Amino acid sequence: MLFHSLSGPEVHGVIDEMDRRAKSEAPAISSAIDRGDTETTMPSISSDRAALCAGCGGKISDRYYLLAVDKQWHMRCLKCCECKLNLESELTCFSKDGSIYCKEDYYRRFSVQRCARCHLGISASEMVMRARDLVYHLNCFTCTTCNKMLTTGDHFGMKDSLVYCRLHFEALLQGEYPAHFNHADVAAAAAAAAAAKSAGLGSAGANPLGLPYYNGVGTVQKGRPRKRKSPGPGADLAAYNAALSCNENDAEHLDRDQPYPSSQKTKRMRTSFKHHQLRTMKSYFAINHNPDAKDLKQLAQKTGLTKRVLQVWFQNARAKFRRNLLRQENTGVDKTSDATLQTGTPSGPASELSNASLSPSSTPTTLTDLTSPTLPTVTSVLTSVPGNLEGHEPHSPSQTTLTNLF
């Protein structure tokens, strides 16, 4: 369209009419703004008013401008304050304390879940590491002392929401944790202990610090315990009562580091049980000596103890039960042998015992003459000669001797 044949006022009138038509026909570009349902629009600017850009502060003389957070912006001035991304073509933008953010930077800085190490936001699509109720970036899940990155399957410990690797957590439990702990020294000590174990210097090399490993893996006996033949119908009940009898006024202690070698300098960690906890565990032990994971979960809810503590208690109770069974078996064998010796069993050779059982009785027999009651009694003594009766010859003289007493 050429405007050279028109005068000045007519040209301005035509331009204004074209602007009004463009304003009515041009679609508004809007986007929802977080926390306020504010729209970011790009209307055409009218000639009767002058708008100031909220970004640069200058006058907006462009045909179109952006409206965000109830402010006007140049299309080039609406940017993220962090990454400087131009938000002209973005669907959404976010405002916080007067600053404009893109979606990624806003969630990174002001999201609900934050990394417990760097305290920065965690994106919903990002892989994380979880420990208890805390969430970490993959690169932030490291040991507090040596900054060793921990991955899935590594052993670690936590104290006061701080993460430690296995070596430094053991040193922390031992109570000899220095201010600047050298990770290389601990690794060298562990290697030396492993070499000593391979050389046959003892089993303590497996754990140079002599401390338990709280890695969630129990040392409970696998499967059901082997069944033993009971010496009597009431032996199981008697052994159970003997194994689990204790004074109700005293608290029973559980040695949690029993499966591991103990050190003289290390104080043994013990767990004290309350009376209702002991009664619950004993009553269940009378029903089942080796509870499974489901039973342990129910017992943990009733007693308030952890599954690890319950596993160790049942393991110790089974060991006591077996020891008492063996003790009762040995006591029964000793009593049986003593009773046999007291009955007066003949101690002669086996041949003499068998011959004596086959030979006539050696008890003296009295014969009375019924024809002469007044005569003295004639006593004959039958004397048994050791030997087999079947071995005597048929013509051998009788071994019975008649003694005339008058």
Swiss-Prot record:
Record-annotated DNA-binding residue ranges: 266-325
Resulting phenotype, residue 53 to A: Reduces transcriptional activation
A molecular function (GO) term: metal ion binding
Gene3D superfamilies membership: Cysteine Rich Protein, Homeodomain-like
PROSITE patterns: HOMEOBOX_1 (PS00027), HOMEOBOX_2 (PS50071), LIM_DOMAIN_1 (PS00478), LIM_DOMAIN_2 (PS50023)
SUPFAM superfamilies for this protein: Glucocorticoid receptor-like (DNA-binding domain), Homeodomain-like
CDD domains (alphabetical): homeodomain, LIM1_Lhx2, LIM2_Lhx2_Lhx9
Subcellular location: Nucleus
Gene Ontology BP terms: anatomical structure formation involved in morphogenesis; axon extension; axon guidance; brain development; cerebral cortex development; dorsal/ventral pattern formation; hair follicle development; maintenance of epithelial cell apical/basal polarity
Family matches, as InterPro entries: HD, Homeobox_CS, Homeodomain-like_sf, LIM_Homeobox_TF, Znf_LIM
Domain of life of the native organism: Eukaryota
Motif (Nuclear localization signal): 307-323
Low complexity: compositionally biased ranges: 357-375
Key words, A-Z: Activator, DNA-binding, Homeobox, LIM domain, Metal-binding, Nucleus, Repeat, Transcription, Transcription regulation, Zinc
Limits of the LIM zinc-binding domain: 53-105, 115-168
GO cellular component, one term: nucleoplasm
Region (Disordered) location: 250-270, 328-375, 387-406
Ranges of biased composition (kind: Polar residues): 328-356, 396-406
Residue spans crossing the bilayer: none
Subunit-structure text: Interacts (via LIM domains) with CITED2. Interacts with POU4F2 isoform 1.
Domain free text: LIM domains are necessary for transcription activation.
Functional note: Acts as a transcriptional activator. Stimulates the promoter of the alpha-glycoprotein gene. Transcriptional regulatory protein involved in the control of cell differentiation in developing lymphoid and neural cell types.
Protein name: LIM/homeobox protein Lhx2
Organism, scientific name: Mus musculus (Mouse)
